[in-house]
């Protein structure tokens, strides 16, 4: 399962990149707005050292303008993936991008039906929002399983990019259910390393190492 970071914070991205564990980045207008920087500048800087997919979202809601914005975003770097909302106008844009060989990430997916429509339009990635579904009383993890089964039934190549991942259990479960990729905030990434037995075990090793002769 590929690991993406859901952030526009350059320091966070560099920390994970230096570990050799980073496969890509997802961003959205809300995340980039927090940086206080120009949208395209942030994407360009990320792409300068992250060579995997970097999702950058269009801001329009009509297909012609989405296509115009997406074409501009795709010029920033070869690894830019144009992020498009899962609405009818978005599907028009996705089809147009697919015909031009431009990768897309269809976002705000909350049903398996939506995921199938996005795949038929030619989406490279589909982003089901696990945590947000949980928030309103639905099973976000079950959605991952449903999409995986449908895609496998028909040999669909669209990659499942699990999003809105809130904690390590989400991370583990989307992996078990066959997500191709997961995107998570830096805070959740840090949690993946944590376990009290790891901490206590390391403390014991460090203490015992003081008794060794090198």
Swiss-Prot record:
GO terms (BP aspect): carbohydrate metabolic process; pentose-phosphate shunt
Transmembrane segments: none
InterPro entries for the chain: Aldolase_TIM (IPR013785), TAL/FSA (IPR001585), Transaldolase_3B (IPR022999), Transaldolase_3B/F6P_aldolase (IPR004731), Transaldolase_AS (IPR018225), TSA/FSA_arc/bac (IPR033919)
EC number(s) given by UniProt: 2.2.1.2
Pathway note: Carbohydrate degradation; pentose phosphate pathway; D-glyceraldehyde 3-phosphate and beta-D-fructose 6-phosphate from D-ribose 5-phosphate and D-xylulose 5-phosphate (non-oxidative stage): step 2/3
Record CDD domains: Transaldolase_FSA
GO MF entry, a single one: transaldolase activity
EC category: transferase
Active site positions: 83 (schiff-base intermediate with substrate)
Compartment(s): Cytoplasm
Annotated catalysed reactions: D-sedoheptulose 7-phosphate + D-glyceraldehyde 3-phosphate = D-erythrose 4-phosphate + beta-D-fructose 6-phosphate
Major location category of this protein: cytoplasm
Any one Gene Ontology cellular component term annotated for this protein: cytoplasm
Pfam entry (one): TAL_FSA
Source superkingdom: Bacteria
Keywords: Cytoplasm, Pentose shunt, Schiff base, Transferase
Family stated for the protein in its record: Belongs to the transaldolase family. Type 3B subfamily.
Alphabetized HAMAP family for the sequence: Transaldolase_3b
Role description: Transaldolase is important for the balance of metabolites in the pentose-phosphate pathway.
PANTHER family: FRUCTOSE-6-PHOSPHATE ALDOLASE 1-RELATED, TRANSALDOLASE
Entry protein name: Probable transaldolase
Organism name: Leptospira biflexa serovar Patoc (strain Patoc 1 / ATCC 23582 / Paris)
């Amino acid at each position: 399962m590929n690991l993406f970071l859901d952030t526009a914070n350059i320091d966070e991205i560099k920390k994970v990149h230096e570990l050799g564990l980073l496969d890509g980045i997802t961003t959205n207008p809300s995340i980039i707005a927090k940086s206080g920087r120009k949208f395209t500048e942030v994407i360009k800087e990320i792409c300068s050292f992250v060579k995997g997919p970097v999702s950058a979202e269009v801001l329009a809601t009509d297909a012609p303008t989405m296509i115009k914005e997406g074409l501009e975003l795709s010029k920033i770097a070869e690894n830019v993936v144009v992020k498009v909302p899962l609405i009818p106008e978005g599907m028009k844009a996705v089809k147009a991008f697919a015909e031009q060989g431009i990768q897309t990430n269809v976002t705000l997916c909350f049903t398996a039906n939506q995921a199938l429509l996005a795949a038929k339009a030619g989406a490279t990635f589909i982003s089901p929002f696990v945590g947000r579904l949980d928030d309103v009383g639905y099973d976000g993890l079950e959605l991952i399983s449903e999409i995986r089964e449908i895609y496998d039934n028909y040999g669909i190549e669209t990659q499942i990019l699990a999003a809105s991942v809130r904690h390590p259990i989400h991370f583990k479960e989307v992996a078990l259910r066959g997500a191709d990729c997961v995107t998570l905030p830096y805070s959740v990434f840090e949690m993946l390393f944590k376990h009290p037995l790891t901490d206590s075990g390391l403390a014991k090793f460090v203490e015992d190492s003081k008794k060794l002769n090198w």
